[in-house]
Amino acid sequence: VAQNQEILRQKEEIEAQKEEIESQRDLAERQRDQIAGQQKQITDSIRYASRIQSAVMPRTDTLATFLTDYFIYFQPKNIVSGDFFWVTRLNDGRIAIAVADCTGHGVPGAFMSILGITLLKEIIAYQQVNTAGDLLDKLRQMVIAALNQSGQVQDSHDGMDMGLLVVDAT
C-alpha cells in the first residue's frame, strides 16, 4: 500500500511537472508569435518609409532632363538608407548635383536624408543661392536649426557629409 501511494504521488508530481512544462511552452509560443507580429509591423512600417524615401529622391526621368551619361548605384544596407542623391536646376540655369551620407544607418539615417533633401529643395525654391559654397552654408544653418543644435558639447552630432557640384550645362 505504501509503495502504491508513493507511485501515485510520483505520478501526480510528474503530471504537475508536465502541465507546468506545457504551460511554459504555450507561453513561449505566444511570446514568439507576439514578437513575430511586432517584427512584421516594424518591417512593414520601414518598407513604407522606404517608399516615402524613394519618392523624395530624383526619379530616373528627372535625372535624364539634367544628365545624359550617368548611372545611379543606390543600395541601402537596410531597407532605408542614410545616403541620398539629388539634382536640380539653379535659378541661373546651372545644375546642382549632390551626393550625401547622413549620420546613422537605417531609420535614423533615412530621417536625416529626407531632412537633407527637403531643406535643399526649400533653399532652391525660396532663396537666391547660386554657388555650391552658399548652398552648403545655408544647408548647414538650416540643419542646425531643424535639429535644435546650439554648438554645445551635449548637442547631437547628427548631420551629413555631402559632395555638391554646380555645373554649367551649356
What are these regions (language model features)?
Residues A2-Q3, R9-Q10, A16-Q17, S23-Q24, ...:
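Acidic/polar-enriched heptad-repeat coiled-coil alpha-helices
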